[in-house]
Amino acid sequence: MREPEGGSAAPPVRYHVGDLAVARIAARRARTVPGVVTLRADLSQTLLGLAGTWLSPDPVPAELRAEGVAVAVRGDRADVRVTVVTELGHNCRDLAATVQHEVGAAVRETTGLDADVRVTIADIELP
């Protein structure tokens, strides 16, 4: 690490990444995993979404939505819960492992936070 002129080291960087920012990163990456049809919001997210739609006339673009992802950032860790819908023909265990890996990597790469990612397969779409 390079020291600034004058011989003193730079102070450590202090920052906080909000829950919504992490949720959007996680949702965006989870949607790209082959076999993920959609993300599914839980009841609390559905109710908040309805309230937000009623209160805000401007809809949130699809790529910025975080439905189906719940996040709690605590210090340098993010607890991430992702709820996905898949389609028949994909192995649920393999899909969950891939989503877990991809979302964790995206959160680490983008925010610097360690992520504990839990995946729920909520439904399987039939042809």
Regions found by a protein language model. Give the residues of each.
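A short beta-strand micro-motif common to beta-rich folds, especially ectodomain repeats
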Residues: 99-103
